[in-house]
Amino acid sequence: MAETESCTFHVPSLEEICSILKSGLLKNFADVNVIVTECPDLTKEPFEFPVKGLCGKSRIADVGGVPYLVPMPRLDKVYNVNTVAKKIGLPGAYILGAGATSHRSLGMNAELIFSVQAESTSTLAVNKSYVASVNPGDGSCLLEKYRDRNNDNDFGLLSNLYACEGKPGKVIEVSVKRRIGQDNFVSCMRKSLKEHYGENAVGMGGTFLIKQGKAKLHVMPREYSACPLNTDEDVNGWLKFYDMTAPLICQSVFVSHDPGYDLRLEHTHCYSHHGEGGHYHYDTTPDTVEYLGYFHPAEFLYRIDKPSATHLVGRD
């Protein structure tokens, strides 16, 4: 795996982050409640994580990047969760987030929804990740458990990951209803932090539920585009978009400011227990939507295998 760069994030207190998020969310949602609380047991439904919490030595890893997918895919870009955990100094880490599958592993392109505890010196990896692909039969979304497809812990091209020891502890609980603004849930929180902290980059990771309503998600086709995808319009024409139904469980990573590492500032992938999942864009039912999330700031940023030639296409 290629070069790794790292830096420290600005880490405000949980109480201070609560205050900043609340003031920003109130501009975008009619009902807002943001508090510091004990992380719920995430091994329980609907999350079913392999660990109980989001705490302990928190960090964010931005691996690869969109330039390895578009304009043309770099199928040689294959990464491994266990290797990433070691590179970020946290073997055995719990890792959540959003990325792409390895074509070498699955023989297709698909969305990867990360929920995996990396291997340690004494334990094997516990991979509870999901894969969302386009059903070749009818074009619908097909959601599968990663372990039903493959026993490895690889991924490809790009990912945005939050890693921690998976311990219980204090987290930020965000509960909002009825969207009255234009920003999606994650963008609103990210922009709130950016407005307050400026170039002091704050990184956040966590999980949230879309409890009520519907949301626009996309799933990448199984086959990579035969033609170069040179613009956002090209990319959107290639992707498959869906209106998906709550409840959705969403794994999210966002950073308030890019301190010069060519970061993807936000990336969220969702899964469900009713067969739907993919890349989150925004809710489509503002009057009835309801979100409930649990988040924790990251202490460190790791940038792994940053593309040398970059662009801003396909980063929504």
Curated annotation (Swiss-Prot):
It holds the Pfam family DUF1907. One of its GO terms (molecular function) is zinc ion binding. It is an enzyme of class 3 (hydrolase). Its main location: nucleus. Its EC number is 3.1.-.-. Zn(2+) binds at residues 267, 269, 279. It is found in: Nucleus; Cytoplasm. Transmembrane segments: none annotated. Monomer. Exhibits ester hydrolase activity on the substrate p-nitrophenyl acetate, in vitro. May regulate DNA damage and repair by regulating HIF1A degradation via chaperone-mediated autophagy (CMA). This is Ester hydrolase C11orf54 homolog. It comes from Xenopus laevis (African clawed frog).
